[in-house]
Amino acid sequence: MTVDERSGYLKPHWPAIKAPRLAGTYQPQPALRIEIPQPHGRLRQRGLPPVTDRVIQPAIAQVLRWMWEPPFHPNRYGLRRMRSAQQALHRAQSEVIKGRKWVVALDFDSVFDRVKQDRLMPKLKAEIQDKARLGLLNGYLKSGVEINGRYEKTAEGVPQGSPRSPLLSNRVLNELDRERERRGHPFVRYGDDCPIYGRRPRAGERVKQSIPHFAEPTLGLKVHVAKSAGVRPCNRTVLGFTCSPRPGHTLKVSEKAVEKVNHPVRGLGRRTRGHCYLSAYR
C-alpha cells in the first residue's frame, strides 16, 4: 500500500487496525532502512515505517510529548511546543553577553543509533502505566529493520524517520541535561547539538574531559573527545550562526551556511557578461 492509497484504506479497516494495538497484541513490522548522503561523505540512516504505522506513531508521540514536556529541561529547544531555533540562538547569544567567552562543543557519535534499549525500557516502565501503550512502544523498538529485503534485529538505537524517535532520544538526553545543570554548566540544546559555555579555556577543558565519564557508562552515549573542542563563540557554529566577538555580540550567518546556499545557486547559470541578473532565474 502506498501513501496515496492510505486514506481510502484506513477508513473501512480502522476498527481492525485499532483493536490489536489497544489490546497490546500488535506486532509492528520492521522499518525500511535507507541511507541519505551527508556532507564529508557520511551517510545518515533512516528507518521508514509501514504506511499504517505512520498514522499510529504520531498519536503515540503526541501523548508522550504531553507527558514528558514538564520534566524536560528549560534549556532544551528542539522539538518542543512554543520553542524555536531562534529562541535557542538568542539564549546562546545571552550566555556570551554574560561574559562566557568560551564554548565547548561535544561531538556525540550518532545519538539516535546509540540509545540502549535495555536501559531505556525500565525508565519507560516507571513512567508509563498503560501496559498496552508500553507494549506497543517496546514492540516498535524491537521490530528491527529491513535492508535490501533482508531482516535485521536492532538491539540498540531508535531509527530516525518516525515521530517517536526524536522524542525517545530526547528523553535519554534529558538526563544529560540535568547532569549539566547539577554541575552548573550553562548550555543550550537543540537536538543533539549542545554547546556548553564557560569563562575560561581551563573550565572548558574540564567539561570536555568530565562529561564523557557520565554519558558513556550511564547513558551508553559515546563522545569523540578528540573531535570535541573548546573555541571562541565566533569560531563555533550554532544552528548555522556564529556570535561576533565585537561589542553587542551580534549573530552572524556562518561561512559554511552561506556556502551551502551559494553552491547550488552558482549552478543556475553560466558566468557570462552582459546579462540581467533576473535572466539567471528564468
What are these regions (language model features)?
Residues E5-P28:
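Amphipathic alpha-helical blocks
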Residues V51-T52, I56-A59, Q93:
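Duplex nucleic acid-engaging cores and interfaces of nucleic-acid transaction enzymes
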Residues M1-Y9, R33-I34:
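Short secondary-structure junction/hinge motifs that connect adjacent elements
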Residues Q45-P50:
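Conserved phosphate-binding loops in nucleotide/dinucleotide-binding enzymes
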Residues M1, Q62-G78:
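Charged boundary/loop elements
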Residues K142, T218-R282:
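A conserved non-catalytic segment of reverse transcriptases
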Residues P20-G24, P28-E35, P39, P71-N75, ...:
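Conserved polymerase palm-domain catalytic core
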